[in-house]
UniProtKB/Swiss-Prot annotation:
Signal peptide: none
Major localisation: cytoplasm
Native source species: Rickettsia peacockii (strain Rustic)
Organism lineage: Bacteria, Pseudomonadati, Pseudomonadota, Alphaproteobacteria, Rickettsiales
Subcellular location: Cytoplasm
Superkingdom of this protein's organism: Bacteria
The name this protein goes by in its record: UDP-N-acetylmuramate--L-alanine ligase
First-tier enzyme category under EC: ligase
């Protein structure tokens, strides 16, 4: 039954329970359902920003997973990250409580709206946030379900009043191809989630379906600077596709005259749409976040805005109002006039982009780049080991911790130390070091940080919490640290 149909009935709404409600994707859907008037509760192993936020709304949160948590619930929502042996899943199966995948619940929400789905291996969260800002500047108020905390809203999801919904579409388990979107964005396609897809061609095929499943009146927005995306665009003839890029002269939307610093990026845009005579130039667009990759993300948002006739003024205002996304090159502190950056980069391509941005800024400040990386998941490290060996070139000094398991079992020979050993042995980096304990990063910063340096703390695990606690850790060691966030 569609949620809208259920909403129309006068029956008492039954309780929806989220297993792993603190996850960024799960918490967003839970918040939207709660704001729509549904009874929502959930469980997670530990308290975090998302669980605290949901609790502040009055949503019941259980810490820990247990059979009794799903007493008196009518539906259970899970994501692909939840272990099938979870006691709440086992209890739901025993009691024949319907178990709904997160992607299916998202699809139900999107089915009621004109939806924009943002996918790609990297850049989804920032792009989703940028698209949302442009919609708001155009006088629309979209519902947004994002994969990260939007600084403008201090949440990853919010209920709007218009008929538009903008969502980050997670490609990790192919469920994104079933999302009923009207507009689809593909930022890039790289080898990722191969533990699920098994090979790269299958992953590419999923993105092909993501576009071809659009209704005939919809359109896709694709970055053809990325060669795999370009090839895909060339192969698809049955759907309208708007392209963008920086290096691709044949793209419909191109950025040029690019300038970037630690706090922002400024650029001009040339727009040459198919079946539209002439070229439009938008001068001096500014976004409050650095990096070439973020300019590309902005171009995707511009493509949507142009196609929906938002107007140049609304596009510029939307970017002016954008305040970034947490954990996307977020400056959290300063020590000894060096900037400490918290970043979500956990894939080799993301690491390259983050370090390239840091290197560009450090060079302007006569500083160096100190990278502290916490690998995430044994399976990712195993599939992309060779790529991880080659992605740290822009770090002047490199420290790698052991792997954050994220619930996975160890894989023999796949460790943070083995990565450092291979990097050193093959001479891919002459200053690569293994960091046995994350706590040792305090000493690394004290010993190495100098004025103008960029200290990049990267990963999808608990390194973010560590980065945000550095002021206290350094102070307790007798050193002064200025907190930025």
């Amino acid at each position: 039954m569609l949620l809208l149909e259920l909403k129309k009935t006068n029956q008492t709404l039954e309780t929806i329970h989220f297993i792993g409600i603190g996850g960024v994707g799960m918490s967003g859907i839970a918040e939207i359902l709660y704001n729509l008037g549904y009874k929502v509760q959930g469980s997670d192993l530990v308290e975090n920003y998302n669980t605290k936020r949901l609790e502040s709304y009055g949503i019941k949160i259980f810490l820990g997973h247990a059979e009794q948590n799903i007493t008196n619930v009518s539906y259970v929502v899970i994501s692909s990250a939840i272990n099938p042996k979870n006691p709440e899943i086992k209890e739901a199966l025993e009691r024949k409580i319907p178990i709904i995948r997160r992607a299916d619940m998202l699809a139900e929400l999107m089915r009621l709206k004109c939806s924009v789905a943002v996918s790609g291996s990297h850049g989804k969260t920032t792009t989703t946030s940028l698209v949302a800002c442009l919609f708001e500047a155009a006088g629309l108020c979209p519902t947004v379900i994002n994969g990260g905390i939007i600084n403008n809203k201090l949440t990853n999801a919010y209920l709007g009043s218009s008929n538009y919904l903008i969502a980050e579409a997670d490609e990790s388990d192919a469920t994104f191809i079933h999302i009923p979107s009207t507009i689809a964005i593909i930022t890039n396609i790289d080898p990722e989630h191969l533990d699920y897809y098994r090979d790269f061609e299958t992953l590419i095929g999923a993105f092909r379906s993501f576009i071809t499943n659009l209704p005939f009146y919809g359109f896709a927005v694709c970055c053809i600077d990325h060669k795999i995306v370009r090839k895909l665009v060339d192969e698809i003839t049955e759907r309208k596709i708007v392209t963008y890029g920086i290096d691709s002269e044949d793209a419909h939307i191109i950025a040029f005259n690019i300038n970037t610093d630690i706090a922002s990026s400024t650029f001009d845009v040339k727009i040459s749409l198919p079946n539209v005579l002439g070229t439009t130039i938008i001068e001096k667009i500014t976004i409050p976040t650095p990096g070439r990759h973020n300019i590309l993300n902005s171009l995707a948002a511009i493509a949507v805005g142009i196609e929906l006739d938002f107007g140049i003024k609304a596009i510029k205002n939307g970017f002016n109002n954008f305040k970034g996304v947490k954990r996307r090159f977020t400056k959290v502190a300063e020590y000894n006039n060096a900037s400490i950056i918290d970043d979500y980069a956990h894939h080799p391509e993301e690491i390259k982009a983050t370090l390239a941005t840091a290197k560009n800024i450090a060079n302007k400040q006569n500083g160096k780049v100190i990278a502290i990386f916490q690998p995430h998941r044994y399976s990712r490290m195993q599939y992309l080991f060779d790529d991880f060996m080659l992605c740290f070139a822009d770090a002047d000094i490199l420290y790698i911790t052991d792997i954050y398991a994220a619930g996975e079992n160890p894989i023999e020979g796949i460790t943070g130390r083995s990565l450092v050993d291979k990097i050193t042995k093959r001479k891919h980096h002459d200053k690569a070091n293994f960091l046995a304990e994350l706590d040792d990063a305090v000493g690394v910063i004290i010993d190495n940080a100098a004025s103008g340096d960029m200290i990049i703390m990267m990963g999808a695990g608990n390194i973010s919490s560590f980065a945000n606690e550095l002021d206290g850790r350094l102070s307790s060691s007798g050193f002064s640290c200025h907190t930025v966030v």
